[in-house]
Each structure stands twice: as structure tokens, then as C-alpha cells.
Amino acid sequence: MMKTLGLRILGEKNVGRLDYLLNRKSKDSWGPLNGQKIRQGVYADILKRIGFKAIVETGTYRGTTSDYFAASGLPVYTVELHPRMYGYSMQRFSKDSRVHVYQGDSPVFLRKLAADPNMPKSKVFFYLDAHVQDSSRYFKAPLVEELEIIFSAWSEAVVMVDDFEVPEMGYGFDNWGDERNLSVSCLRPLKNLKLSAFFPSVEAKLDTGARRGWIVLCREESVVKTLAGIQNLRSYVLQ
């Protein structure tokens, strides 16, 4: 009861700021990119081969992956829907000019970036992890809308999606049944975009960390050729 009262008095955003200042750590943190060494290696290789101008992340949580992205030296734009997690990350990066933290709905955030004349509109790396705000119940993932915005507004974009089903490789993914899971079937409405897809070529048992599935998406042929040469990535034909 006292905890609930405190939340009401302070507000969730301020409680999140206190979480950071009092060093209240999350018990379920695996590290950046879910602590998965294979995925981290693929990201590093992509970063080396493509001259990105910025990184955009949806689903900040406590900023572990945001901080990892910032080590690239590129500006990082990240959005978090949950007020408490936003407060935590806002406080964490309050003195870090590399990381720009926003609160709100990810498609709205992406539309604002798309309309911002100061935001690069080519060669941006996107990391999408805003699909679940409460693991105890189903929320419709904003993924399709996010991808429509990204590939309509940015050229030579590379998108990595977290928690995605990797066929027959043993990775975990967001699965709510009845075609509500994150899988290639949910990408069918985007057929007109003619996206190219890549999955990890390494089985989950050989990776580290949370062993969650992921997919990399792109559009331009030049980017497809670059990704095709990256170790531990395999091309997948979207139907």
C-alpha cells in the first residue's frame, strides 16, 4: 500500500528517476542486445560496413542497449512508452549528449523523426524492441506500422527486430498464438515494400544471454549485398 501511495504522490516518471539515483538494478537484465554475443557481433559488423549517420531505438527500458549503441559515437534517439522506465533512462542520460530519450508511442515518435529536417534520412540503423509493455497480457505489436514509417521515410535503412521467431533455430520469441506472434507471417502486410530479410545462421544453443530471436530487414540492393557478406547472417526469402 505504501509503495502504491508513493507512486501516486511522486508520479511514475519521478519514481523511475529515483530508481536510477538509488541504483535500483533490474534483476532480469542480460546486458546490451539481450547479452547475445552472436547478435552483438553481427551488429558490430554491420556498423563497420555501413556508414550510419544515426541510431534509432524503440523500447528504451533502462537504457542498457542505448548506452551500448552510444559507444559507436553516433547520435542515438530512443523512445520508451512506460513512464517509470522513461524516468529511469531520462535520468541515466541526463548528462550524455549522445543519447536523446523520448517518452511516448513508437509510431508517433518515428513520424516526428521522419518530419524533423535535422534528422538524417539515409543510412540510419533502427533497433525495434517496443512490442510488449506487460508480459502478462497481449498487446498488439506496433511493428508493421513502425516498418511502414521507416521504409517510407528513410533510404538505406537497416532494421533489427528483437523477440522475433527464427524458424527451427531454438530462439525464444514473443508468441501469443492465433497469429499474434512476432514471425514472418506478421510481415505479410508489408509485401509491397519488397523487403529483404536475414536471420541468424547460428543456433540459439551456441549463443549467450537470453537467446531471443531476431531478424534484420533492409530494402535497397546495395544494402542487401553488404548484409549478405556478414558472418552469422543468412538470407531468408519473405513470402
Language model features: what each stretch is:
Residues 1-125, 131-239:
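A short alpha-helical cap/connector motif
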